[in-house]
Amino acid sequence: MAAITAALVKELRERTGEGMMDCKKALEKAGGDIEKAIDDMRASGAIKAAKKAGNVAAEGAIAVKTDGKAAVLLEVNSQTDFLALQDDFKNFVAESIEEAFAQKLTDAAPLIASRESAREALVAKCGENVNIRRLVRVEGDVVGAYLHGNKIGAVVVLKGGDVELAKNIAMHVAASNPEFLDASEISAEAIEREKNVFLQLNADKIAGKPENIVENMINGRITKFKAEASLKEQAFVMNPEVKVGELAKKAGAEIVSFTYFKVGEGIEKPVDNFAEEVAAQVAAAKQ
């Protein structure tokens, strides 16, 4: 049995939104296996679905630049959304993405190094910490990108088709955040877990039903799971009557890859305790 650490309880709480004690009990029951704990909580009806790991809010901006053959996605973080809306921060982000694209950088490390002086100057001026967090560069036959409000960015690489198609699929990715490119990428383990959760959640409904009926119900749930999780199987947001994979195929294109960035994924933002803050200010005033 894995140790039930505070960090593990905290992660489960962030992924499910449930209380600390409920998360601790679920982990103890699951022997410290966080994925099993999530499945058990779903099966018991405690939660409808687990949030993706690290889905914690933070501030900043996503930037994207493409020329139709390559694209760069960049995330720069700030402590507050107020700063993210200011021209000084926007200029820093714009200059950073331009440099990253021009230098054909494939990760954030060299950009962090070259932009350090500019970052320090921005921090000194605004009084907030600013960090270049991550960067991805993709190249291909056809590359399209979409940016939603500087908070979500997506790029799609196609073989065949055109930039407009790639951009439209990138828009879909930004809206739907698929987990997989194709249903074939979904592991047998993930499918088996989904099946077990379904059986536990619907134990009363399937009790006494013929085996073939139960099998059909399971297959229906797995088909829905695959459609929800894989890009090619999802209904296209601009025309739900067609799947994304079919859309690309009709245009003579093949979806090679996609990348999705959302500001703050995986970053824990401190939550201020207003009562403690007031108490601290009162205590300081008495000194």
Swiss-Prot record:
SUPFAM superfamilies in UniProt: Elongation factor Ts (EF-Ts), dimerisation domain (SSF54713), UBA-like (SSF46934)
Region (Involved in Mg(2+) ion dislocation from EF-Tu): 80-83
Stored InterPro entries: EF-Ts_dimer_sf, Transl_elong_EFTs/EF1B, Transl_elong_EFTs/EF1B_dimer, Transl_elong_Ts_CS, UBA-like_sf
Keywords in alphabetical order: Cytoplasm, Elongation factor, Protein biosynthesis
Gene3D superfamilies according to UniProt: 1.10.286.20, DNA helicase RuvA subunit, C-terminal domain, Elongation factor Ts, dimerisation domain
Coiled coil: none
Location(s), subcellular: Cytoplasm
Signal peptide: none
Cellular component aspect of the GO annotation: cytoplasm
Lineage: superkingdom: Bacteria
Pfam families: EF_TS
MF terms in GO: translation elongation factor activity
Family membership noted in the UniProt record: Belongs to the EF-Ts family.
Function description: Associates with the EF-Tu.GDP complex and induces the exchange of GDP to GTP. It remains bound to the aminoacyl-tRNA.EF-Tu.GTP complex up to the GTP hydrolysis stage on the ribosome.
Name of the protein in its database record: Elongation factor Ts
Species annotation: Pseudomonas entomophila (strain L48)
Gene: tsf
